[in-house]
């Protein structure tokens, strides 16, 4: 078997029997996590024609009975050949025309999937997008690592002045349309894919736009179906963070920590590829006519609230206690949590500015 991915949580292998391939995913910690994912896949495929065709079939599942992984939970899934969206974007030879076709087709299909979600809804008062956002914010605030970033009133990122995250999240509540969405929870679901990230979208045929979906996120007990779509728009930010293709600079370690510069380390063509699909790294897609033409105003705001949630969750999920300094003068460094924290600041400023003009 070929190892494809290995982490503290999961190991993923590619298995070959004769001329056929399959994928085996093993839970390294809790078997419950893999069975939660199995149950989610089964539920999605059972209740949705979209997921029935998009998610590969599970061919076996259970507890491994012998060998190194004895006692571990697993499932085996049909192998889907091809490139992921992230791999296509990171290929400098990918044609812009192909990316435009991908963008058009994938937007239509992914938006359709979240707008037609008919999964069982939850109606408890505390189950809302507002509560999810404030829960993630609370988790960040509990990490002493971010105290200085939270406590200063003004930040400067790439020569633009911003307030801190807490200011913008509090400001969201001042807009009528947001308050209305906050007060509603009839669109919240307890079943969803929740993970339309570019690494989970596979294109089986070269230069074709038909795609498959893998790795739904079974950790959510409830969420807005639009979180799945937000995860798609989070791809550019996530990939930049995951592949360490960024550099943060500041001269403020001896003073007030308030001025930062973020530089992308991707090759120019790769940046162009990502921008074709996702606009720029700071999530400034608010004037994307193709996106707006496929979403009502209400749905567009839901998407952005979920992207806010996605970014905040990203800070928590990718938190690092250590800062990796690139220069001896401690002016240039990398830290995934700080990178996402700063990107979240910029997104929230753009979002609140958009609301001021359109509320």
What are these regions (language model features)?
Residues 211, 217-289, 309-327:
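Active-site activation/catalytic loop segments of kinase-like enzymes and analogous catalytic loops
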Residues 12-16, 173-225:
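Active-site acidic catalytic loop and adjacent metal/ATP-binding pocket
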Residues 44, 83-185, 190-192, 281-284, ...:
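Conserved kinase catalytic-core helix
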Residues 8-43, 86-92:
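ATP-binding glycine-rich loop module of kinase domains
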Residues 56-73:
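Short beta-strand micro-motifs within the conserved protein kinase catalytic domain, predominantly
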Residues 2-5:
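Protein kinase glycine-rich loop
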């Amino acid at each position: 078997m070929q190892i494809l991915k290995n982490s503290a949580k999961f190991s993923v292998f590619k298995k070959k029997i004769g001329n056929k391939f399959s994928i085996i995913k093993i839970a390294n910690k809790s078997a419950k996590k893999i069975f939660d994912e199995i149950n989610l896949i089964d539920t999605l495929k059972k209740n949705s024609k979209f997921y029935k065709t998009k998610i590969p079939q599970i061919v076996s599942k259970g507890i491994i009975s012998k060998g190194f992984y004895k006692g571990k939970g697993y499932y085996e899934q049909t192998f889907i050949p091809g490139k992921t969206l992230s791999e296509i974007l990171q290929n400098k030879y990918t044609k812009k025309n192909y990316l435009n076709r991908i963008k058009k087709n994938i937007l239509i299909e992914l938006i359709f999937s979240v707008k037609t979600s008919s999964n069982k809804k939850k109606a408890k008062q505390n189950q809302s997008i507002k509560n999810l956002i404030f829960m993630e914010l609370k988790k960040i605030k509990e990490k002493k690592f971010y105290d200085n970033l939270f406590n200063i009133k003004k930040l400067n990122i790439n020569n633009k002045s911003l307030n801190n995250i807490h200011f913008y999240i509090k400001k969201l509540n001042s807009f009528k349309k947001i308050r209305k969405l906050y007060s509603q929870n009839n669109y919240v679901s307890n079943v969803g894919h929740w993970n339309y990230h570019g690494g989970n979208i596979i294109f089986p045929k070269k230069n074709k736009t038909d795609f498959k979906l893998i790795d739904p996120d079974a950790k959510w007990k409830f969420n807005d179906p639009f979180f799945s779509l937000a995860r798609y728009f989070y791809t550019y930010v996530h990939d930049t963070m995951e592949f360490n293709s960024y550099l943060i600079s500041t001269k403020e370690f001896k003073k007030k920590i308030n001025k930062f510069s973020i530089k992308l380390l991707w090759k120019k063509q790769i940046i162009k590829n990502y921008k074709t699909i996702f606009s720029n790294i700071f999530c400034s897609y608010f004037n994307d006519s193709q996106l707006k033409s496929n979403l009502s105003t209400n749905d567009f705001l839901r998407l952005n609230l979920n992207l806010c949630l996605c970014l905040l969750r990203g800070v928590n999920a990718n938190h690092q206690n250590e800062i990796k300094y690139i220069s001896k003068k401690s002016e240039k460094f990398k830290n995934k949590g700080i990178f996402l924290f700063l990107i979240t600041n910029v997104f929230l400023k753009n979002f609140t500015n958009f609301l001021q003009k359109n509320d």
